[in-house]
């Protein structure tokens, strides 16, 4: 994905300028943050996936306890219009690194960026690992009717209220308003 992102950087910049009128500096910052996330994940993935020794409860004093990270499963990423590249690709990098499959729904309010992202992701990943859905509110509603193990959406996302309601009803894990919580690190409370 890192090489494909570098290869399509100019096309992405044109799309960001077409959709949002972003300056070259702002575009490079958005793309650079994604490239930085990819490099960071490549460096630290081994440590993040390692089995960790944890405290054993007193009742099982003779045993040893470990915690092993495991993927959630299928992740839905609904990105907003204001940072279409960053808030689509950064959670995707984390979801893929964690071993999840993903359905990516770029914003309909940034159509040029959404089309470039679709081409980029289809070039990088087979459709059984990463699927891209283009469209508006109808597609958002249809996606939210499906079962996902993790849903990422942002406050600026048009499907925010519906997505938040869906997450609360089904107890899906969710990230809203921040991309600091990664699909690999967050756990649902039992």
Task: Label every model-predicted segment.
Residues 1-66:
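N-terminal Rossmann-like NAD(P)+-binding subdomain of aldehyde/semialdehyde dehydrogenases
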